[in-house]
From Swiss-Prot:
Family: Belongs to the anoctamin family.
Note: The term 'anoctamin' was coined because these channels are anion selective and have eight (OCT) transmembrane segments. There is some dissatisfaction in the field with the Ano nomenclature because it is not certain that all the members of this family are anion channels or have the 8-transmembrane topology.
Organism, scientific name: Homo sapiens (Human)
Membrane topology (Extracellular): 1-352, 446-505, 569-595, 737-768, 907-955
Protein name: Anoctamin-4
Localization per Swiss-Prot or TrEMBL: Cell membrane
Job description of the protein: Has calcium-dependent phospholipid scramblase activity; scrambles phosphatidylserine, phosphatidylcholine and galactosylceramide. Does not exhibit calcium-activated chloride channel (CaCC) activity.
Lineage of producing organism: Eukaryota, Metazoa, Chordata, Craniata, Vertebrata
Gene designation per UniProt: ANO4
GO MF term list: chloride channel activity; intracellularly calcium-gated chloride channel activity; phospholipid scramblase activity; protein dimerization activity
Amino acid sequence: MEASSSGITNGKTKVFHPEGGVDLQGYQLDMQILPDGPKSDVDFSEILNAIQEMAKDVNILFDELEAVSSPCKDDDSLLHPGNLTSTSDDASRLEAGGETVPERNKSNGLYFRDGKCRIDYILVYRKSNPQTEKREVFERNIRAEGLQMEKESSLINSDIIFVKLHAPWEVLGRYAEQMNVRMPFRRKIYYLPRRYKFMSRIDKQISRFRRWLPKKPMRLDKETLPDLEENDCYTAPFSQQRIHHFIIHNKETFFNNATRSRIVHHILQRIKYEEGKNKIGLNRLLTNGSYEAAFPLHEGSYRSKNSIRTHGAENHRHLLYECWASWGVWYKYQPLDLVRRYFGEKIGLYFAWLGWYTGMLFPAAFIGLFVFLYGVTTLDHSQVSKEVCQATDIIMCPVCDKYCPFMRLSDSCVYAKVTHLFDNGATVFFAVFMAVWATVFLEFWKRRRAVIAYDWDLIDWEEEEEEIRPQFEAKYSKKERMNPISGKPEPYQAFTDKCSRLIVSASGIFFMICVVIAAVFGIVIYRVVTVSTFAAFKWALIRNNSQVATTGTAVCINFCIIMLLNVLYEKVALLLTNLEQPRTESEWENSFTLKMFLFQFVNLNSSTFYIAFFLGRFTGHPGAYLRLINRWRLEECHPSGCLIDLCMQMGIIMVLKQTWNNFMELGYPLIQNWWTRRKVRQEHGPERKISFPQWEKDYNLQPMNAYGLFDEYLEMILQFGFTTIFVAAFPLAPLLALLNNIIEIRLDAYKFVTQWRRPLASRAKDIGIWYGILEGIGILSVITNAFVIAITSDFIPRLVYAYKYGPCAGQGEAGQKCMVGYVNASLSVFRISDFENRSEPESDGSEFSGTPLKYCRYRDYRDPPHSLVPYGYTLQFWHVLAARLAFIIVFEHLVFCIKHLISYLIPDLPKDLRDRMRREKYLIQEMMYEAELERLQKERKERKKNGKAHHNEWP
């Protein structure tokens, strides 16, 4: 049974069962269609009544379809029904009030002066610009392509000219066919096997039971945002020959505004502005300054005096603001189909990925919070913390030269407890969980992306052959070769020239990485010098917490250096990328992205790597300290360990960076737009209110970043790395990332809707090179977390002590009772008389016992001074080292095996999606066969009419 194009009536779907059971629009006709044998008894009166009711609904449907556009791709289908009145009603109402329809349309700045032709694109130039001849040729060729054009001067600056462009139906149809724009041709009809009929009845009963339950608060309000999903129609590449197969109820709204702008931009990219084979395209005119700006229009104001619930949305921008960019809907799902319709697939995919990433952070944040709370609840039962807090008789050696005093181990009680919050028995489990989480996140994102790509008609979409960058063309215009794709001659870059440029670029990257290392070295020197300064500070609070004060100030200085170097790195990455001379814009974008990510990743994480793996590891021991340039003694860890320094580094950097990024994303455009409005008020006086048309309002907004979505993706990718790479040391990182992303989604939405010009609706199948970077970060996170657990934390030393040296040695137990004596076993003894002259402290320690101290303790596994080999490594040191190396190997192999197993078990495409794709392919082929059959029948009729004989190929 073939599905007709009117398969959806009043929101109810026609469902066919292969064995013959039929559901029509919610009317139950439980009769079997038996191909053979006697017919079943049927109550024809009930069928007749059902058919009469169906006929009424069909008439209502046709009346609605005549008044409004198609519910599949109509650009106004998401607006409030109250705004979808007929044109004749609008005209009569407006004429009664003394206003005509053209005047109404003209006043909102979205149409030409006639009020009928919608503005699809805006070009801006200055009359004082000397490139007049190029513009005239370009605009003459624009008219030759069939585009309509009008010009308007600015209300505040007569030197600024706005060129309004409109694409008629004939132009849109011609280029939509060339661009393979997919349009709706048939509503979707889902075939259900007979065996699922019983389950569908159960689902209906469950849905009735759920009616009294509260609605899902995260779902968008259907009254405000009806028909959210745009996947209720099958689509096919548009063809003017098969135009009658497509669902067209209104030619003006058949192509939505984003598609119209994309088609116009496609035309502008192929129009010549000067004689010559390479003098073509709008991008080159923007580069040489002939035009100052080019952008599609926003669809009116994003604010309204009336409530959206009572009066409906005035336009899609207003609808996006109320349902997406407003802070009041921060907890609701994103209207991704509306975002895609307004901004295009590329921006829609970014917000889909960001929303998916944020949603996947919920389990990671919950488990991380659980690990932290587990540390809180087990704090009083931690044997290690108890021993540190009760060790009033253990005197620790000074942590710096001269000015640092001796201190009791019990003075580190608070730091030992804080360390236990992050370094406890659940840390290893959380590290394994996060490694698996990263894999699951990426695998399920591939499935989610596939569903989005299908719903948004991106499955079979392929990027067009890209144009050559003007810079590449100007550099290599003298050397040409034949393009194997287009068959046309094009500029060519020699292999030797390309290699030499890549070598220079790689050298520049290496040099900038050395600059980062130098900055880290400067931070290390600052920490070494400052700890002694703070130890001699006159304020007791700072003097007694000199190491914490040193770490805190060093992190803040490091953050400032990071932000300053980011500005430098952007300029260097731009210089090196231009030096490479990439051939196309996508090659340029990928090269620039890779450099910027590498620079910023190293810049952001270099100090963190130093604290995690080098701080306190190569300091020597009292009496034989290692020094920088034979002068500065390397910094030691706090008596409670180095993990607290790593936690402070990650927490401060993460909070400060996310706060700064959010301010720059929203605050900077707000300040710029406020400054623009302020200049206008100063020029025209505050008492004069000017009503700007939409094109001038949009021109005064900030243009989208020159690098597109690069900054948005980079911020989130760096956050993903910060969340996964050192998560074993900071379990609260996913929670901070989740809170930030909830704000980030609405900030980005607000910025796109209110502060930026409307970007061109670009298409993309995926998130591009960023997916490969995410996979690389996932692999790196496994390695770093293995090293953090084995090297930075005390998990392995505690485990070795419990099974080998503690009270439970040889018994196979590792509880808290087995940790008795661990603190004493992890500290070595040093004879104070063995201090070097420049390391000997000013105090002799008599304030502790009334007599000068003879011995002090330090963190290490070394022999006492009276042994055969003074201060040599003990056997326990080698056992701990072997256990650490073994843990790294076992942890990495185990987690990588789990990651690969998960990747293998999770298919990239859901099964139902594969079936839907096959169904759509079948219907498209059927449509083509029907069109071909109609053509042949038409030819046969014409031949019979003309009396010409024809040859039958098939019997």
